């Protein structure tokens, strides 16, 4: 067994400021029971979190949610992060954004804004978002972000209901003069896992979308267009797992709205007691807490991971995915073809070939559905 690697620094801090959100995306990665979570951290508590993380080496902070724009202290949080020396990202739907707030964020020192879209056409975008005004607002704010001197960074979550229009999505991004476009095929955590039958593309859909994306890359390069297209494939069509978060508690630190500290944004669902910043400082949380040490190193591994010569590369894959699909977070990620549970993934691929779940039939991410799920 290789020696346990030294614990890395929490270089990337994800500040999930709130679970409140005006949209209802059925692929949201937030916990299913978000409506039953505790009170949000105050401005001062977030200041303390940011200061402690910065002292430990954190260099980049992402303000996320839910929808972070619902926090009225967002400009204050950005300004404090800037003062502390962070590179600052705002990850937003654009709903709740306006010219005045963009100017405020610019003045506060915000470095980067990413706006998400649900689709390239208004009807599908608004249906998925659960809002009749979402698409027009997103278009307006994408242009406004660019006008204020920010690079235009767009994120499209692709799935079986919009991936066949990947060419239209890319054309929209080109028309908007986007600088970076993330074409992120749905990853199946949170609400997306619940709605997998309505979201997972077929292999043919995925291969076609990737081919078209590559054709557009060649076209953009030939035209001298600097727009960068980033295509993210789903785990379900891989034969080896990803090195999730570059290893458990090794680089990435999430703080949830109520102050729970997690080694990744999906870990809250695990049957592990994670610490809270209301009770402990981040140094204790990162280096000493049970939750952050639970899956570090290799001693926790079972076969086939334990004797696998690839374990130092992929760390056994995603613990959350192992738990969701096998019921035990210590098992190998079933995405891996070496896993005895890989048949779960093969079955999901087969089901995608015949799935008939329409957008309207999916369980949308909203307070009502979350409360029902929380009650069991």
Swiss-Prot record:
State its Enzyme Commission number(s).
1.21.98.4
Reaction catalyzed? [PQQ precursor protein] + S-adenosyl-L-methionine = E-Y cross-linked-[PQQ precursor protein] + 5'-deoxyadenosine + L-methionine + H(+)
What are the BP-aspect GO terms?
pyrroloquinoline quinone biosynthetic process
Membrane spanning stretches: none
Q: Which GO terms describe its molecular function?
A: 4 iron, 4 sulfur cluster binding; cyclase activity; iron ion binding; oxidoreductase activity; S-adenosyl-L-methionine binding
Enzyme class comes to oxidoreductase
Question: What cofactor does this protein call for?
Answer: [4Fe-4S] cluster
Q: Which family does it belong to?
A: Belongs to the radical SAM superfamily. PqqE family.
> Quaternary form?
Interacts with PqqD. The interaction is necessary for activity of PqqE.
- Give the protein's recorded name: PqqA peptide cyclase
Gene for this chain? pqqE
């Amino acid at each position: 067994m290789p020696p346990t690697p030294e614990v890395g620094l929490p270089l990337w801090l994800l500040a999930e400021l709130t679970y409140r959100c005006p949209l209802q995306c059925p692929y949201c990665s937030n916990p299913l029971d978000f409506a039953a979570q505790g009170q949000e951290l105050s401005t001062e508590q977030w200041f303390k979190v940011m200061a402690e993380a910065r002292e430990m080496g954190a260099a980049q902070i992402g303000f996320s949610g839910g929808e972070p724009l619902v926090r009225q202290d967002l400009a204050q949080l950005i300004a404090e992060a800037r003062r502390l020396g962070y590179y600052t990202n705002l990850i937003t739907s654009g709903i709740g954004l306006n010219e005045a707030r963009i100017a405020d964020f610019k003045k506060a020192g915000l470095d980067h804004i990413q706006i998400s879209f649900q689709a390239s056409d208004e009807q599908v975008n608004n249906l998925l978002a659960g809002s009749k005004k979402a698409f027009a607002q997103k278009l307006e704010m994408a242009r406004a972000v660019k006008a204020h001197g920010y690079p235009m960074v767009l994120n499209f979550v692709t799935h079986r209901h919009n991936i066949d229009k990947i060419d239209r999505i890319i054309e929209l991004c080109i028309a908007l003069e986007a600088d970076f476009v993330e074409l992120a095929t749905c990853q199946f955590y949170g609400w997306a896992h619940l709605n997998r039958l309505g979201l997972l593309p077929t292999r043919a859909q995925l291969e076609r979308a990737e081919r078209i994306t590559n054709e557009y890359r060649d076209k953009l390069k030939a035209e001298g267009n600097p727009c960068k297209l980033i295509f993210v494939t789903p785990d379900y069509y891989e034969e080896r797992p990803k090195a999730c978060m570059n290893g458990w508690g090794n680089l990435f630190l999430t703080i949830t709205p109520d102050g729970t500290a997690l080694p990744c944004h999906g870990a809250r669902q695990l049957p592990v007691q994670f610490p809270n910043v209301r009770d402990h400082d981040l140094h204790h949380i990162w280096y000493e807490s049970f939750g952050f040490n639970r899956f570090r190193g290799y001693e926790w591994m079972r076969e086939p991971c334990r004797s696998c010569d690839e374990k130092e590369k992929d760390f056994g894959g995603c613990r959350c995915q192992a738990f969701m699909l096998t019921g035990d977070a210590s098992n190998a990620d079933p995405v891996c073809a070496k896993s005895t549970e890989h048949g779960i993934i093969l079955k999901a691929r087969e089901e995608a070939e015949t799935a008939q779940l329409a957008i309207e039939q999916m369980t949308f991410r909203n307070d009502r559905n979350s409360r029902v799920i929380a009650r069991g």
